[in-house]
Amino acid sequence: MNNEILPRNFYERPTLVVAGELLGKILKFSNFSGVITEVEAYIGMDDPACHAARGYTDRTSVMFGIPGFSYVYFIYGMYYCLNIVTETEGFPAAVLIRGLKLIEPLKANLSGPGILCKRLNITREHNKLDLTISHEFCVYESHINLDYVCTPRIGISKGKEKFWRFKIF
């Protein structure tokens, strides 16, 4: 596996660009590694599905922070979801990691952000971590270009019309 961690400037770009280019990259967490296969973009206070749509709160503070940090939150009283902050400090945007094809230590397809976090044991403890500095929790360059499709986001009640879900096919 390539050990080239994606640098901060990878995330300091428009969220839709980052989302598309995260596909095929390697997410590394603890002893797990996997190819990112599906993501969704959430962009700014004008995006009704974005947690930051209602403004700055303790929960969303990381989204207004430095790009390249993790944003982990709890949903439905049972699942955590992993996002990576994008764009510029002060502008709330992130990419939700929805799918992963595990390659280490075993092979498995993890479909859905809650299942992904449960299998990898990603919890609120992993919120607000810098993914550009640690080989334990990061995204590696893969130098693989894959074809993908853009579809409407799923599992949300507002902003469903935006084709901001990116998935390898």
Curated annotation (Swiss-Prot):
Keywords: DNA damage, DNA repair, Hydrolase. GO terms for molecular function: alkylbase DNA N-glycosylase activity; DNA binding. Pfam families: Pur_DNA_glyco (PF02245). GO terms for biological process: base-excision repair. The keyword Nucleotide-binding does not apply. Belongs to the DNA glycosylase MPG family. Its EC number is 3.2.2.-. It comes from Wolbachia sp. subsp. Brugia malayi (strain TRS). It comes from the Bacteria. This is Putative 3-methyladenine DNA glycosylase. It is an enzyme of class 3 (hydrolase). The keyword DNA damage applies. The lineage of its organism: Bacteria, Pseudomonadati, Pseudomonadota, Alphaproteobacteria, Rickettsiales.
